[in-house]
Design a protein with these regions (language model features):
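Catalytic loop of the DD-peptidase/beta-lactamase superfamily, centered on the K-T-G motif
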Residues: 3, 9, 34-72, 155-158, ...
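N-terminal Sec-pathway targeting helices
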Residues: 9-19
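Bacterial N-terminal signal peptides
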Residues: 17-31
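Short, conserved catalytic-motif segment at the N-terminal edge
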Residues: 38-91, 113-115, 122, 130, ...
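Active-site helix/loop module of the DD-peptidase/beta-lactamase fold
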Residues: 43, 57, 87, 92-96, ...
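Catalytic nucleophile serine of serine hydrolases
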Residues: 95-96, 185-188
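Active/ligand-binding-proximal structured segments within catalytic/core domains
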Residues: 101
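The feature captures the short pre-catalytic strand/loop hairpin that immediately precedes
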Residues: 165-177, 245-260
Length: 387
């Protein structure tokens, strides 16, 4: 998976000047909670940024006052067939998947099946880390907040084992580079380890648990996992990379094979409509349409800052109080507290930015590789919603 630093660098920027650009647009769902000029401004921004950053297709959801006010598809999910993006088109959401794993663990806390601060070896007795002291000390909280002391993503082998068990066996080969609980080090495989613990506790795969206890209650009927889920979906986005000479080049599906084992950290596939409902769950203290998915107490814990993120992650001067929570980043931008995450895998980018105090949020998904597109759109559209 690709690093998450660029999202943080973008959050402090100013609103883009908006202008219209001609491109295919597929409108599926629009509420009238916002005025027509606001929708026009959103369209203009999306289309301009898609043109600027060579994006084939994108999907957008806007949330205001606790309700979805706009869901829309732009451009093409497949350039070869000119198939348009709709609000039902599946995109890989990358590291936003980490918050789903954290939510699953939170549900088990509600059911008294697990404790965030109990050493994870209690749930995975065969676990071995390179330092025996860390083996006995690392907790689920530390795995979900990237504070386990295990090294950051860039220090792990590029080759991902094909199974979750293989990933877990590989932990013993990695050095402990910080005292558990002391330092933020963004570690995707640590979230996979938390998901593996969940599997041992509930006696089923992380995928089966997530579908039953998160997807089904949220009505995420088409959401899936990894490469297999995307390949089998009729309304899926083809991933692209931009080449200065050849234009938009399809990325072979084989490049996403690693997502199956790493699904708890970056392999969920979903539509913008489904992620919009997931955003509503976050903004309504664990409730959606009158159904409680997780307790309000645990939803607050998921969003509570756990560890300050280092200065090397903060390039935008307007960002304050940058922290990682449990599956989420948090920050204060111009006096507004944000809960957010981005996602990045080959041919896909995603962003979800929430302002809980205003019950507002933005979801942007794309089948291109421009972080500037997803993050710029999310930031600027949230500014509009908060005016």
């Amino acid at each position: 998976m690709i690093g998450a630093k660029t999202m943080i660098r973008s959050l402090g920027g100013r609103l883009f000047t908006m202008c219209a650009v001609s491109m295919s647009v597929a409108v599926v769902t629009i509420s009238l909670s916002l005025s027509a000029p606001d929708f026009g401004a959103a369209d203009a921004l999306m289309l301009r940024l898609m043109s600027t950053y060579n994006v084939s297709g994108a999907a957008l959801a806007l949330i205001k006052d606790g309700g979805i006010v706009l869901e829309k598809g732009y451009g093409y999910r497949d350039r070869e067939t000119d198939a348009p993006v709709t609000t039902a088109t599946l995109f890989n959401i990358g590291s936003i998947s980490k918050s789903f794993t954290a939510l699953g663990i939170a549900q088990l806390v509600d059911q008294h099946q697990v404790d965030l601060d109990t050493p994870v070896i209690r749930y995975i007795p065969e676990l071995r880390l390179s330092d025996p002291r860390a083996t006995q000390a690392v907790t689920l909280r530390q795995l979900l907040s990237h504070t386990s002391g295990l090294p950051p993503d860039e220090q792990w082998p590029r080759q991902v084992p094909p199974t979750r068990e293989g990933i877990v066996r590989g932990f013993v080969t990695m050095p402990i580079t910080a005292q558990p609980g002391a330092r933020f080090q963004y570690c995707s495989r640590c979230v996979v380890l938390a998901a593996y613990a969940l599997e041992q506790i509930v006696g089923q795969s992380w995928e089966a648990y997530t579908r039953t206890h998160i997807f089904v209650p949220l009505g995420m009927a088409t959401a899936s996992f990894g490469l297999l889920g995307l390949e089998q979906a009729p309304d899926r986005a083809q991933p692209y990379r931009h080449d200065a000479v050849s234009g938009e080049v399809p990325i072979p599906w084989s490049r996403l094979q690693y997502l199956q084992a790493l699904a708890p950290a970056g392999g969920i596939d979903a539509s913008v409509s489904e992620i919009a409902d997931y955003a509503l769950l976050q903004l309504d203290d664990g409730m959606l349409a009158g159904h409680r998915v997780v307790s309000a107490q645990m939803m607050a814990e998921l969003h509570r800052p756990q560890i300050a993120v280092g200065a090397d992650w903060t390039a935008a001067a307007r960002i304050q109080n940058l922290h990682y929570a449990l599956g989420w980043f948090t920050a204060d931008v111009r006096g507004v507290h944000l809960v957010y995450h981005n996602g990045a895998n080959p041919g896909f980018r995603a962003a979800i930015v929430l302002a809980p105090s205003a019950s507002a949020g933005v979801v942007v998904l794309t089948n291109g590789e421009s972080d500037r597109f997803t993050e710029g759109a999310a930031r600027s559209l949230l500014e509009q919603l908060l005016r």
